[in-house]
């Protein structure tokens, strides 16, 4: 490009320029139009204007994606503008054909001036112009597509519309602050979803600058500015600015950056190429700007490109949320520029601004937002706006965001889901639902999870999925206006943060059940048409409030505990069928010695109960069947449970008199044989240990070493059972822990041999030694053993039981007294508690005796006989201690195995006991 071409008056349209054919492809060529002001200013212009480099050709003002240029024309409206045009040199009123669209002032002419200043610098003499097809191909501003009108004449002139890309607001001359410079006017003729984002200096396409508002008296000049920056200005000064002829100064009220619009809506702009002004739509209106408004408060919605088609509220909200959460959205980076205050700065309060399909749902931000923190959820406006609370009455004055829309550190609250700790929600198995990452660490939600939030909300309530807890709660399923399924914050139930999480889903009353809440009503109306199968997950309040605890009332009551057949009643203390009842009676009375052909683990059920009588009898004994046991048929279980709740140990030490001892006896009809036992004795029955097996192999021949090893294994298991039983014993836990250990170590052998006597007495009527269901020794097997004399010593106990006909209640009380029958010589640490406990169980033994004896003399004699038996056990157990210690010492020689716990007890305590370092507590003197 030659110097003559650079000095062509058509390069820059100024006052007095003569028309000449334009160069196609040059973006700065003037329109093919001869304005009313034509003079001779060629020399002035040529001294300023410089050629444009070819590298920037087509990029400064790219063509819009439309057809060839449309010729411009003037209308008869210039008559009304003659006075105004005469006052402004270099400025004219541009009108479209037919007067349908009047050219509005360029909203951001300061950007154009900055671009002109930046790019109109000498870059050499070589310059060429792109052809029209080449220019058409380089269109980086076609991203808005059909959103912009294809024909500028199609826009009504009465609207006064200018594209927000090139529009700017009116600013008073005296207001030079950054906040005031960035004010925008909400258009009346265009809803916020149709607005477009205003490019700022931070944009990649606009290397813009700030504004220096100052009046200039020069007319129609294009001159170089000093480039200095006025104090208080929003950004660096613009260069090559067209100055107005009659500037009024700061007090004149005239805008410093652009000419004010005429009262009739007709505004003035500099001449320029029609190709670059065609897609522009004005946003200027006569209404004043809102004070303190954020410059992006009404333009961010345009950036996300919301379609104009009528959409469902839920779909529009989901689409908006999806666009806000996408990676392409930089969290409001476009807000950084000279037209808006920096993010994090406080915004002045402003009235609520309508927001498209969500009217009256925004309010200004209260307080300073956190620096560089963009909300993850809820607010699709800029930091200057937040979702407004729907409140009524006096509460409307207190503006606070909805708890389920807040993205801060405060905990969220949801109507149907109480608060809970913040776990990540597992991926859901519901069809059509994507996994949503919850918790403070999640930065976004996948777009798939954003669609269909209304159905998601309903399915959450129906299926009972736990809510995601974290810095935000589940999103609302509908706009706040109509049919919302969310309640305001005031109606939410307060739940403590430390409370345990309740049931998975809250009960919803349906079909005549308890009253439906607001959320349940929405669910009832919407769910059957959407997802009928999920109605099966709903349950009434009565069912949801029940805890998953199973008492004895909920267990099957008509099943035989032995074979699983239908039970006919409670026989020998156990709920059994008639077949098992007869079998047990015949097996006990006939004294049969059954042997298992297997490993004592045969299956006993309705079909195979007759295959192995040994295992069937073992199972009967394990279930607690006792020959001559009490019949508790049709007994009120509630009364028994209330009796157990009233258990209390008496505090007095003295023995009760006869009336007190016999006062607990209640007589019923003889056919029922039901007696109400004392509460403490009844509790002792409930904590009685289960049957323990020895694990002896009866298929192998009996040897002394194998039998002793099996007895040691049985003793180890019974020792553990004694520890468990003593811990459940009323009053025993009140003793010192050392005293508890000492009492168990001193009495474990007495308890084992006493239990052996009771089992032999009840199961085999004292004819054999019933060590365990899988280890029963008759007299013939005893004689073959090396410890036959020891077996005869132990056999004395069941024989005494048979002689005295000891009852179960008496046995339970005597067993506890055996635990408290031996103490150290120096006494126990909690000696007083020990004596009180022992006296209490002595009284319980007297009560147990009074259940059977009907007089003072028989009861006293019975008490003497039973206590004498307890005293005799000391000498009997001493023989067992001596034999056990000798066998333990010679265990390697005798090939007898001792378990670990039993070995420790034997090595630590048996030498003390045999040396007389313990004190036996006797009822009678020798």
Curated annotation (Swiss-Prot):
- Give the UniProt entry's GO cellular component terms: chromatin; cytoplasm; nucleus; plasma membrane
Cross-link position, Glycyl lysine isopeptide (Lys-Gly) (interchain with G-Cter in ubiquitin)?
Answer: 388
Keywords linked to the UniProt accession:
Cytoplasm, DNA-binding, Isopeptide bond, Lipid-binding, Lipoprotein, Metal-binding, Nucleus, Palmitate, Phosphoprotein, Receptor, Steroid-binding, Transcription, Transcription regulation, Ubl conjugation, Zinc, Zinc-finger
A single Pfam family it belongs to is Prog_receptor
Which residues lie within the region annotated Mediates transcriptional transrepression (in isoform A)?
166-305
Please give the Gene Ontology molecular function terms for this protein: ATPase binding; DNA-binding transcription activator activity, RNA polymerase II-specific; identical protein binding; nuclear receptor activity; nuclear steroid receptor activity; RNA polymerase II cis-regulatory region sequence-specific DNA binding; steroid binding; transcription cis-regulatory region binding
Q: What happens when the gene is disrupted?
A: Infertile. Inability to ovulate, uterine hyperplasia and inflammation, severely limited mammary gland development and an impairment in the induction of a sexual behavioral response. In isoform A-defective mice less oocytes are produced, only a subset of implantation-specific uterine epithelial target genes is regulated, and an increased progesterone-dependent proliferative activity of isoform B in the uterine epithelium is observed. Isoform B-defective mice showed unaffected ovulation.
Region called AF3, residue ranges:
1-165
Q: What is this protein called?
A: Progesterone receptor
């Amino acid at each position: 490009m030659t110097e003559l071409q650079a000095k062509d008056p058509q390069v820059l349209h100024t006052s007095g320029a003569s028309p000449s054919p334009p160069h196609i492809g040059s973006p700065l060529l003037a329109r093919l139009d001869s304005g009313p002001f034509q003079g001779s200013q060629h020399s002035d212009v040529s001294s300023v204007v410089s050629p444009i480099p070819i590298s920037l050709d087509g990029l400064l003002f790219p063509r819009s994606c439309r057809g060839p240029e449309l010729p411009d024309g003037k209308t008869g409206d210039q008559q009304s503008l003659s006075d105004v045009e005469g006052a402004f040199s270099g400025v004219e009123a541009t009108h479209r054909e037919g007067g349908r669209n009047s050219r509005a002032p360029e909203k951001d002419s300061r950007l154009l001036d900055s671009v002109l200043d930046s790019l109109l610098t000498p870059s050499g003499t070589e310059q060429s112009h792109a052809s029209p097809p080449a220019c058409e191909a380089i269109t980086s501003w076609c991203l808005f597509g059909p959103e912009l009108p294809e024909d500028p004449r199609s826009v009504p002139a009465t609207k006064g519309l200018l594209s927000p890309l090139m529009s700017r607001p009116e600013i008073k001359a005296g207001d030079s602050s950054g906040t005031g410079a960035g004010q925008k006017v909400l258009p009346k003729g265009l809803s916020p979803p149709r607005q477009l984002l205003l490019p700022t200096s931070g944009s990649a396409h606009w290397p813009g600058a700030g504004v220096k508002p100052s009046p200039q008296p020069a007319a129609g000049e294009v001159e170089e500015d000093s480039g200095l920056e006025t104090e208080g200005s929003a950004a660096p000064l613009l260069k090559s600015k067209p100055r107005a002829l009659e500037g009024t100064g700061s007090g004149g009220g005239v805008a410093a950056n652009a000419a004010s619009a005429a009262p009739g809506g007709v505004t003035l702009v500099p001449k320029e190429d029609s190709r670059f002004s065609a897609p522009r739509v004005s946003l200027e209106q006569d209404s004043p700007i809102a004070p303190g408004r954020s410059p992006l408060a009404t333009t961010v919605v345009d950036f996300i490109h919301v379609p104009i088609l009528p959409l469902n509220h839920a779909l529009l909200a989901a689409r908006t949320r999806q666009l806000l959460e996408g990676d392409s959205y930089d969290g409001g980076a476009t807000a950084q520029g000279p037209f808006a205050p920096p993010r994090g700065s406080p915004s002045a309060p402003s009235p609520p601004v309508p927001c498209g399909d969500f009217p009256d749902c925004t309010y200004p931000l209260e307080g300073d937002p956190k620096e560089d923190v963009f909300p993850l959820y809820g607010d699709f406006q800029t930091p200057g706006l937040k979702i407004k609370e729907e409140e009524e009455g006096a509460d409307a004055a207190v503006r606070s965001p909805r708890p389920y829309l807040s993205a801060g550190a405060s905990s969220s609250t949801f109507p149907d889901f109480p608060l809970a700790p913040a776990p990540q929600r597992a991926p859901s198995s519901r069809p059509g639902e994507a996994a949503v990452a919850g918790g403070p660490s999640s930065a976004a939600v996948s777009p798939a999870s954003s669609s269909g939030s209304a159905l998601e909300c309903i399915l959450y309530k129906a299926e009972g999925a736990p809510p995601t807890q974290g810095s935000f709660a589940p999103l609302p399923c509908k706009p706040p206006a109509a049919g919302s399924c969310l309640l305001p914050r005031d109606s939410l139930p307060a739940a403590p943060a430390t409370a345990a999480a309740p049931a998975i889903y809250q009960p919803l009353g349906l079909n005549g059940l308890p009253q439906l809440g607001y959320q349940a009503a929405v669910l009832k109306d919407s769910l059957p048409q959407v997802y009928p199968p999920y109605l099966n997950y709903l349950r009434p309040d009565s069912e949801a409030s029940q805890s998953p605890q199973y008492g004895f009332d909920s267990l099957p009551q008509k099943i035989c505990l032995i074979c699983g057949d239908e039970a006919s009643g409670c026989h020998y203390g156990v709920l059994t069928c008639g077949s098992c009842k007869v079998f047990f009676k015949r097996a006990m009375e006939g004294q049969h010695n059954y042997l298992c052909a297997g490993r004592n683990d045969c299956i006993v059920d309705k079909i195979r109960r007759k295959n192995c009588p040994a295992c069937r009898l073992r199972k009967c004994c394990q279930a607690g069947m006792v020959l001559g046991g009490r019949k508790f048929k049709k007994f009120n279980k509630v009364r028994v449970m209330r009796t157990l709740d009233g258990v209390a140990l008496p505090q007095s030490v003295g023995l009760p008199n006869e009336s007190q001892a016999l006062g607990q006896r209640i007589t019923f009809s003889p056919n029922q044989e039901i007696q109400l036992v004392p509460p403490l004795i009844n509790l002792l029955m409930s904590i009685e240990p289960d049957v323990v097996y020895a694990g002896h192999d009866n298929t192998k021949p009996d040897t002394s070493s194998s039998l002793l090893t099996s007895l040691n294994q049985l003793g180890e298991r019974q020792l553990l059972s004694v520890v468990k039983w003593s811990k459940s014993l009323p009053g025993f836990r009140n003793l010192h822990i050392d005293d508890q250990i000492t009492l168990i170590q001193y009495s474990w052998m007495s308890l084992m041999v006493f239990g052996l006597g009771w089992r032999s007495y009840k199961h085999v009527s004292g004819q054999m030694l019933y060590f365990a269901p899988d280890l029963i020794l008759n007299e013939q097997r005893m004689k073959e053993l090396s410890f036959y004399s020891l077996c005869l010593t132990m056999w004395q106990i069941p024989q005494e039981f048979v002689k005295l006909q000891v009852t179960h209640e008496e046995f339970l009380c005597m067993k506890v007294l055996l635990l408290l029958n031996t103490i150290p010589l120096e006494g126990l640490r909690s000696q007083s508690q020990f004596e009180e406990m022992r006296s209490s169980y002595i009284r319980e033994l007297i009560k147990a005796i009074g259940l059977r004896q009907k007089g003072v003399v028989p009861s006293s004699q019975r008490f003497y006989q039973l206590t004498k038996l307890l005293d005799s056990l000391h000498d009997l157990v001493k023989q067992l201690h001596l034999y056990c210690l000798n066998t333990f010492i010679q265990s390697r020689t005798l090939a007898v195995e001792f378990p670990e716990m039993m070995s420790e007890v034997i090595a630590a305590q048996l030498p003390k006991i045999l040396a007389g370092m313990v004190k036996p507590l006797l009822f009678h003197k020798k």
